[in-house]
């Protein structure tokens, strides 16, 4: 990373940016400047000046006369995180299930939590797992046999894969596997996963598109803390073969330790090398922040068609009439589904009940001011299968006037706070301290040592050094050199002959 880029990130963080979003915006601009040859230098300059990428400007027809009617990418990055530390309540599936325990009937049942500790995969039973299933691979296989189908997803991800068993034959997303192969793939995971209920789309949704990856997205805001409201709703319909396999089995995952606000030392690519979309932050926040919204074609590349159709839904009566799809960089209006030919017209019968429930949930967790909820509409009701504390910047269905007004209010308040001199000094001190600890950790510590842990070690070691615990200074120096606190030596009988044990 160049010195100039580091300075720009520091400047943005002093002015209230979260580090991951500052890096995302700078990376998006850098990638766009380097690879996007479809726009002139003046078009790019205008877009960047107003906080957009030129592709987004063209897509929505943004110009000098209407630019104030839109929330820019830059500003949307700036207001992150709207929900502050409480965002963790709904960004992690297991935490969400525990927080929303009174609403469990509207959430998928969760059976097992799977995560790697050292070299082993830990299998932990969750709230909804029946007592007869053991915390083991045998318990998982028995559950799949009994249920027929279950879903497997990252706790911090957006995609699902289906594990099934029919007539004794196991499968992963329709691919036949043996029980040994299924367990082997689970043992190879690098992410934190949750095994949960398979939620089947109702026939009304399957009449539009027959796969099981269609959902209703609700964007919710709670402007004053006591008036949660759904500001926007649309159906997201599949148009191709859905697959969450790579996200679940092949992508890396980590468990956060400490505050990401203080120490955001995760290494990320500055410019994406192989695809047409900007890499998103893969941390415990903003996990689906962009969701492939920013499509940046390379030279001579064919127009890209998004795999989904978006159908705006009326909040008054749940009706919908017509959808939209992104072809290349053009938003195309649709009356029919492009694959099935089904008319994109109908009504969600239980919309009023759903909106009332969302309002109740919003009042139950008033700390969550802004979120999105993905709802699978079933034959007998609905299930809320995913929550996000910072909904994706819209790809096709832009924020409506109500949501834009709310987000612009958040932008104005954020900029007012960031402009105060005392806040600038506070942010500078905080970010400088973070920068120092990151560099010290990389220089002095073994690979993959987390800066927050090294900071804790340094402070604890300092306290131990000046404590009057009867341990000689020479012995303390030996303890610190070998990674121990001095009082532990006598407690565990540690000396030169056994410290490696």
Question: Where are the language model's segments positioned?
Answer:
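Extended, charge-rich helix/loop segments that form flexible
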Residues: 36-40, 44, 50-65, 254, ...
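Active-site rim elements
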Residues: 83-87, 203-207, 342-348
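Glycine- and small hydrophobic-enriched segments that form the cores of compact globular domains
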Residues: 108-164, 170-172, 187-195
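Phosphate-binding site of ATP-dependent enzymes
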Residues: 145-152, 156-157, 175-327
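Short, surface-exposed charged micro-motifs
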Residues: 162, 217-219, 372-374
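C-terminal active-site "lid" helix and adjoining low-complexity regulatory extension at the edge
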Residues: 330-359, 363-368, 377-501
């Amino acid at each position: 990373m160049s010195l100039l880029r580091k300075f720009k990130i520091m400047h943005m963080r002093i002015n209230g940016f979260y580090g991951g979003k500052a890096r995302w915006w700078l990376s998006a601009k850098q990638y766009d400047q380097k690879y996007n040859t479809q726009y002139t230098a003046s078009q790019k300059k205008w877009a960047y000046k107003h906080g957009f990428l030129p592709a987004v400007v063209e897509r929505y027809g943004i110009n000098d006369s209407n630019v104030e009617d839109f929330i820019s990418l830059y500003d949307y990055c700036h207001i992150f995180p709207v929900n502050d530390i409480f965002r963790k309540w709904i960004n992690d599936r297991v935490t969400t299930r525990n927080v929303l325990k009174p609403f469990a009937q509207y959430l998928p049942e969760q059976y097992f939590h799977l995560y790697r500790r050292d070299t082993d995969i830990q299998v932990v039973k969750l709230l909804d797992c029946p007592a007869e299933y053991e915390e083991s691979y045998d318990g998982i296989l028995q559950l799949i046999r009994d249920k027929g189908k279950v879903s497997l997803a990252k706790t911090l991800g957006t995609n699902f894969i289906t594990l099934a068993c029919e007539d004794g034959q196991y499968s992963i997303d329709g691919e036949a596997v043996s029980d040994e192969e299924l367990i082997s793939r689970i043992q190879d995971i690098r992410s934190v996963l949750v095994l949960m209920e398979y939620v089947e789309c109702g026939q009304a949704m399957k009449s539009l598109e027959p796969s099981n990856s269609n959902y209703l997205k609700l964007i919710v805001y709670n402007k004053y803390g006591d008036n949660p409201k759904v500001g926007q709703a649309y159906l997201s319909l599949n148009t191709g073969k859905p697959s969450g396999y790579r996200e679940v089995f092949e992508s890396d995952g980590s468990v956060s330790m400490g505050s990401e606000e203080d120490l955001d030392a995760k290494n990320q690519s500055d410019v994406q090398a192989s695809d047409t979309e900007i890499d998103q932050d893969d941390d415990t926040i903003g996990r689906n922040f962009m969701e492939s919204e920013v499509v940046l074609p390379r030279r001579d590349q064919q127009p890209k068609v998004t795999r989904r159709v978006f159908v705006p839904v009326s909040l008054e009566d749940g009706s919908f009439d017509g959808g939209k799809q992104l072809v290349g960089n053009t938003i195309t209006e649709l009356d029919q589904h492009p694959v099935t030919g089904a008319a994109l017209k109908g009504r969600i019968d239980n919309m009023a009940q759903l909106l009332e429930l969302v309002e109740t949930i919003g009042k139950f967790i008033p700390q969550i001011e802004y979120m999105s909820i993905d709802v699978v509409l079933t034959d007998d009701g609905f299930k809320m299968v995913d929550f996000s504390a910072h909904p994706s910047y819209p790809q096709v269905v832009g924020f409506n006037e109500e949501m834009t007004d709310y987000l612009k209010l958040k932008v104005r308040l954020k900029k007012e706070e960031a402009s105060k001199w005392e806040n600038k000094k506070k942010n500078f001190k905080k970010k400088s301290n973070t920068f120092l600890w990151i560099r010290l950790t990389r220089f002095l510590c073994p690979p993959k040592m987390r800066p927050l842990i090294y900071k804790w070690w340094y402070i604890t070691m300092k306290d131990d050094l000046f404590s009057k615990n009867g341990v000689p200074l020479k012995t303390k120096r030996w303890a610190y050199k070998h990674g121990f606190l001095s009082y532990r030596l006598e407690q565990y009988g540690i000396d030169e002959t056994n410290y490696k044990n």
